Amino acid sequence: MTFAATILTLYPEMFPGPLGVSLAGRALAEGKWSCDPVQIRDFATDRHRSVDDTPAGGGAGMVMRADVLARAVDHALETRPDSPLLAMTPRGAPLTQARVRQLAAGPGVTILCGRFEGIDERLFEARPIEPVSIGDYILSGGEMGALVLLDACIRLLPGVMGAPDSGDEESFESGLLEYPHYTRPAEWEGRTIPEVLRSGDHARIEAWRNAMAETDTRLRRPDLWERHEGARAQSPSGARRQKKER
């Protein structure tokens, strides 16, 4: 099954962009996924192909019009009714690895890329759109966010990564950051690879990696650590452990 990516955008020339090279590019050439950028202006009805207007209530910038976007969205929903419809916006829910896995397991995605000051809120009220954010910062438009989302999905498609399990231990897959990595040379600028990684003892190596993943997450991403600890406490084994400690 081909993972179908439809992107509603004012800049279709941005796609596939960087997704046309490396793993994603090879997967595109092999038909593992398809890229269909759709020009939003094609759904405008005036001779200027207008897609935006001044914000109600005043203020700076322009707002993307609900009527024009709705025609583009409806076209996408008719074309790919089984694909979830996402909108890249800083007002959306943070994109997580868990959500990426859900999307990658489906038939594809349709992504609406916002521009200017944002999208008329009535569009979200009238259409089944999932607002998604890739972080707490502002970009020039949703296209870069769409590329990020698609890359995260594409690399999880069957046959895209070299080893089938190469993504299983990456950051966020277990709710933690990934453990540190090392490779040759064994010594560099006076710094050596940790002895445990050169021991050949797989049980010790796994224990070290788990411990480092927990330590790094606790120090670098206390928000993730708190979430991880909360989930562990609610699990059956965690509940038994807490009861025993009491």
From Swiss-Prot:
Keywords, comma-separated and alphabetical: Cytoplasm, Methyltransferase, S-adenosyl-L-methionine, Transferase, tRNA processing
GO CC annotation, single: cytosol
Catalysed reactions, semicolon-separated: guanosine(37) in tRNA + S-adenosyl-L-methionine = N(1)-methylguanosine(37) in tRNA + S-adenosyl-L-homocysteine + H(+)
Subcellular location: Cytoplasm
Record carries keyword tRNA processing: yes
Annotated protein name in UniProt: tRNA (guanine-N(1)-)-methyltransferase
Subunit structure and binding partners: Homodimer.
Residues that, per the record, bind S-adenosyl-L-methionine: 114, 134-139
Highest taxon in the source lineage: Bacteria
Organism: Rhizorhabdus wittichii (strain DSM 6014 / CCUG 31198 / JCM 15750 / NBRC 105917 / EY 4224 / RW1)
Enzyme Commission code(s) on record: 2.1.1.228
Principal subcellular localisation of the protein: cytoplasm
Role, per record: Specifically methylates guanosine-37 in various tRNAs.
Pfam families xref list: tRNA_m1G_MT
UniProt region (Disordered), positions on chain: 219-246
Name of the gene encoding the protein in the UniProt record: trmD
GO biological process, one term: tRNA N1-guanine methylation
EC category: transferase
Signal peptide (from-to): none
GO molecular function, one term: tRNA (guanine(37)-N1)-methyltransferase activity
Compositional bias ranges of the Basic and acidic residues kind: 219-231
Family listed: Belongs to the RNA methyltransferase TrmD family.
